[in-house]
């Protein structure tokens, strides 16, 4: 099965003493993954590394840390090597205000909103606007009935931020 094969290759990389390719990220650098899958890391943008992966009930989860965004070239390469696999991702790059997923139906990444109470609960993720608005109303101490109300309240305050998670085609 393709999922098991990819998982085995990730384990192989993780257990290596030295990376397949020289780099400053270690054995789980995305370039090493591209190499072990038969690709050329010089032709695929690989700026990042895998920080965690697990296989449970036939679902392979891979968490990466990358620079400036989701590594779509690596993702597309993996899908080319394993045509039966579909990779769903969630990308969060706070400094660039990027919050997006390709999981249109929310099977793996169902959250569509983030509320950040920097002095309280921290970042909270929400699937539905009603739940978000109820939480934000309590945190901000004011009644918020719409997303527009929330945007206005966040604009007028310090210590709170709000982000909608964009669903992208890919």
Which residues make up each language-model segment?
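Intrinsic low-complexity, intrinsically disordered or marginally ordered coil/linker segments
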Residues: 1-170
């Amino acid at each position: 099965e393709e999922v098991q094969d990819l998982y085995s290759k990730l384990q192989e990389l993780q257990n290596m003493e030295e990376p397949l390719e020289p780099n400053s990220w270690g054995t789980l650098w995305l370039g090493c993954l591209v190499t072990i899958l038969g690709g050329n890391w010089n032709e695929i943008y690989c700026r990042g590394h895998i920080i965690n992966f697990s296989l449970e009930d036939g679902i392979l989860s891979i968490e990466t840390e990358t620079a400036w965004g989701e590594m779509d070239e690596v993702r597309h390469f993996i899908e080319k090597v394993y045509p039966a696999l579909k990779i769903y991702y969630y990308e969060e790059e706070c400094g660039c205000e990027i919050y997006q997923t390709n999981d249109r139906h929310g099977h793996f990444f169902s959250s569509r909103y983030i509320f950040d109470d920097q002095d309280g609960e921290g970042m909270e993720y929400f699937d539905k606007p009603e739940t978000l608005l109820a939480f934000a109303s309590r945190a901000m101490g004011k009644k918020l009935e719409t997303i527009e109300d929330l945007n206005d309240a966040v604009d007028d305050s310090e210590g709170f931020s709000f982000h909608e998670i964009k669903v992208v085609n890919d």
